[in-house]
Amino acid sequence: MKASLLNKLDLLHDRYEELTALLGDAEVIAEQGRFRAYSKEYAEVEPVVAAYREFRKVRDDLAGAQALLKDSDPDLREMAAEEVAEARERLAGLEDRLQRMLLPRDPNDARNVFLEIRAGTGGDEAAIFAGDLFRMYSRYAEKQGWRIEILSENPGEHGGYKEIITRVEGDNVYGKLKFESGAHRVQRVPETESQGRIHTSACTVAVLPEPDEQAAIEINPAELRVDTYRSSGAGGQHVNKTDSAIRITHLPTGIVVECQEERSQHKNRAKAMAWLAAKLQDRQDAAAHREISETRRLLVGSGDRSERIRTYNFPQGRVTEHRINLTLYALDEVMAGGVEAVIEPLLSEYQADQLAALGD
């Protein structure tokens, strides 16, 4: 294991000892805020320290067994050789486990997201594919036990959507969906194509983490233009009777968000403001991300929304994930909500990328 990682583990071990003492201090116990903060940190550090203590014990056992390899007794040497092999195997497993424990956590992973799907090149066929992608993610969300709500939709003339914006709520939503941002390309024969020619269309997907209310980016109300209009979306008999839909324009950036799915103008405004905050935070994060990418090229997660990340080829029943050269002949399963088959290899590749950089 790299010396820099061992140093990190030693520092964590010292912090663990310090936290143990603090949590037993009467003054800390009396102050609930500090006690909760220290308890949370203790819970995060404790499993790492337990694994590190086991690592050190096995390392010491290995050193002892290696010393016996020089003994004059052949039976003792044979026994020591077995112990060395066993200790090396355990040590390798513990080293891998500790490295994964030390990987930096994305603070956004636990957040809910705003999922934006927009038809790109390809006209009607692109809009139909946007509808297919929305169904794919909706079914995946259902399998994950997440809740998905439509904030805004602009239907295509022959089905699907020119644009559909949703909010996805649940456990580890951003952690699972964060690498879905980018250009998704579809190759198939449109129903209106009489010659059987394959057409290529594209949609763009953007996944934005919903900011924490306390840490949300500050928005100056004076920099907003708020328009109300009559909803053309859900609402049954109530549609077009009230100006409940909201459109908010952030004047400095030109970013426009709108929400029309609720009957209440107040609810639509609150959801539109949350979405605007997410877009402004994403804009800010993208600038910082570009700096990181220039320093170290990330195989997965470059964050470029124009990057072609995946191709769905219907005639061949094939899905190709271009960032990791993954090809699956399971298109029907993926489109039916089985996109986990693509998401998991992406997350594994990203973790491998992080491991390679750990301790640099």
UniProtKB/Swiss-Prot annotation:
Pfam families: PCRF, RF-1. Its main location: cytoplasm. It is found in: Cytoplasm. One of its GO terms (cellular component) is cytoplasm. One of its GO terms (molecular function) is translation release factor activity, codon specific. The modification N5-methylglutamine is found at Q237. Keywords: Cytoplasm, Methylation, Protein biosynthesis. Methylated by PrmC. Methylation increases the termination efficiency of RF1. Belongs to the prokaryotic/mitochondrial release factor family. Peptide chain release factor 1 directs the termination of translation in response to the peptide chain termination codons UAG and UAA. This is Peptide chain release factor 1. It comes from Azotobacter vinelandii (strain DJ / ATCC BAA-1303). The lineage of its organism: Bacteria, Pseudomonadati, Pseudomonadota, Gammaproteobacteria, Pseudomonadales.
